């Protein structure tokens, strides 16, 4: 059985590029013995209610959205698997869904920036 170091955060404030104050919450942040970081994020302003992100050696190794557009969520996951975190942010940041100032891909990019800081 793998031991894991779990760090729970109540809420991490995050600002949308549009200037509107929104809260994007990190539900859990776990680092497994093999070095895989597993983060659960509650996105804001989209249909999805949870994003589960696995990162190992600065690459996204698994991605899953809960609720939202099932096919699009699976497509995003298939495309970013194996991609470097920096590249995911570069490609997905700023994508909008209809008239919303954000989207599920944008929420992923914002979550990764929140986790790794603006340097990524």
Ranges and model annotations:
Residues 1-9, 17:
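Bacterial N-terminal signal peptides that target proteins for export
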Residues 35, 42-120:
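Active-site- and interface-proximal helix/loop "cap" or "latch" segments in soluble metabolic
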Residues 18-23:
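Sec/Tat signal peptide C-region and signal peptidase I cleavage site
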């Amino acid at each position: 059985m793998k031991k894991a170091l779990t760090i729970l955060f109540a809420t991490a404030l995050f600002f949308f590029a549009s200037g509107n104050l929104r809260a994007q919450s990190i539900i859990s942040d776990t680092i497994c013995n093999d070095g895989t970081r597993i983060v659960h994020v509650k996105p804001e302003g989209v249909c999805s209610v949870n994003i589960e992100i696995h990162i190992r050696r600065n690459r996204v190794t698994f991605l899953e959205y809960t609720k939202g557009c099932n096919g699009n969520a699976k497509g995003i996951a298939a495309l970013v698997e194996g991609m470097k975190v920096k590249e995911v942010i570069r490609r997905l940041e700023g994508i909008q869904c209809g008239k919303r100032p954000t989207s599920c891909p944008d929420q992923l990019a914002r979550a990764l920036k929140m986790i790794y800081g603006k340097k990524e």
